[in-house]
């Protein structure tokens, strides 16, 4: 049996900004009370300007990443244009709902920038999909992350400030949630590019919070 399916526990956040979005997560994976990994990947690139965060079962999440990545590329080949963020979220929602009697134990954030601007959608294991117009957090550390996000988010926030807000939110969650910890992985998506921040830059920004 694949042990990856039992690696759980996470904090992920998404921040909608005026010029893009920020997706971030910590990198601890737990198996019960055991820290199974300190470098778990939880923020994935789905398309050129689309990313996805995963909280919950690592095995289920990786299967979903492969599925939606392939479907997105096939759509682009057939239509000669990228699928919208809403389209990708709907595709994932339909797949999760079709498997609702054998649910994949994941919470997802799908976000990016398309012709309609920046957007983030949150999805639950049953396929419920909600467009998040401001902020979102998933996983066991989300209550602590929301405390920071709700307090410091502004409607006019740009990605330069949004990435620091995301780092602060996850940093705060790791202090109280035993299933969240280690390094923080941060992705910034604008209409120009999908950029994963260098780990050393994230560490430097995080150090300023202590």
UniProtKB/Swiss-Prot annotation:
Reaction(s) the record says it catalyses: Cleavage of peptide bonds with very broad specificity
Coiled-coil stretches noted in the UniProt entry, renumbered to this chain: none
GO CC annotations, alphabetized: cytoplasm; proteasome core complex, beta-subunit complex
GO molecular function: threonine-type endopeptidase activity
Propeptide: 1-9
Xref: Pfam families: Proteasome
Activity control note: The formation of the proteasomal ATPase PAN-20S proteasome complex, via the docking of the C-termini of PAN into the intersubunit pockets in the alpha-rings, triggers opening of the gate for substrate entry. Interconversion between the open-gate and close-gate conformations leads to a dynamic regulation of the 20S proteasome proteolysis activity.
PROSITE patterns: PROTEASOME_BETA_1, PROTEASOME_BETA_2
Domain of life: Archaea
GO biological processes: proteasomal protein catabolic process
Gene3D superfamilies found in the cross-reference section: Glutamine Phosphoribosylpyrophosphate, subunit 1, domain 1
Localisation per UniProt entry: Cytoplasm
E.C. designation(s): 3.4.25.1
Residues forming the catalytic site: 10
Principal localisation: cytoplasm
Record has DNA repair as a keyword: no
Keyword line: Autocatalytic cleavage, Cytoplasm, Hydrolase, Protease, Proteasome, Threonine protease, Zymogen
Annotated function: Component of the proteasome core, a large protease complex with broad specificity involved in protein degradation.
Recorded family membership: Belongs to the peptidase T1B family.
HAMAP family for the chain: Proteasome_B_A
Matching PANTHER family: ATP-DEPENDENT PROTEASE SUBUNIT HSLV (PTHR32194:SF0), METALLOPROTEASE TLDD (PTHR32194)
Subunit structure: The 20S proteasome core is composed of 14 alpha and 14 beta subunits that assemble into four stacked heptameric rings, resulting in a barrel-shaped structure. The two inner rings, each composed of seven catalytic beta subunits, are sandwiched by two outer rings, each composed of seven alpha subunits. The catalytic chamber with the active sites is on the inside of the barrel. Has a gated structure, the ends of the cylinder being occluded by the N-termini of the alpha-subunits. Is capped at one or both ends by the proteasome regulatory ATPase, PAN.
Record's protein name: Proteasome subunit beta
Organism annotation: Methanosarcina mazei (strain ATCC BAA-159 / DSM 3647 / Goe1 / Go1 / JCM 11833 / OCM 88)
Source lineage: Archaea, Methanobacteriati, Methanobacteriota, Stenosarchaea group, Methanomicrobia
């Amino acid at each position: 049996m694949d042990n990856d399916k039992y690696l759980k526990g996470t904090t992920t956040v998404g921040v909608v900004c005026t010029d893009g979005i920020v997706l971030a997560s910590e990198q601890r994976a737990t198996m019960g009370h055991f820290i199974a990994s300190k470098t778990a990947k939880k923020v994935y690139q789905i398309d050129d300007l689309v990313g996805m965060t995963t909280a919950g079962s690592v095995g289920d999440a990786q299967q979903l990443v492969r599925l939606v990545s392939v479907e997105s590329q096939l759509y682009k080949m057939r239509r000669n244009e990228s699928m919208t963020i809403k389209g990708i979220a709907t595709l994932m929602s339909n797949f999760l709902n079709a498997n609702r009697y054998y649910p994949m134990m994941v919470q997802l954030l799908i976000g990016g920038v398309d012709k309609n601007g920046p957007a983030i959608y949150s999805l639950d294991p049953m396929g419920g999909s909600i467009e998040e117009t401001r902020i979102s957090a998933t996983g066991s550390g989300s209550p602590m992350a929301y405390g920071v996000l709700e307090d410091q988010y502004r409607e006019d926030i740009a990605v330069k400030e949004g990435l620091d807000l995301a780092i602060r939110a996850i940093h705060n969650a790791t202090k109280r949630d035993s299933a969240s910890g280690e390094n923080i992985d941060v992705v910034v998506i604008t209409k120009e590019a999908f950029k994963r921040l260098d780990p050393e830059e994230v560490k430097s920004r995080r150090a300023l919070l202590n």
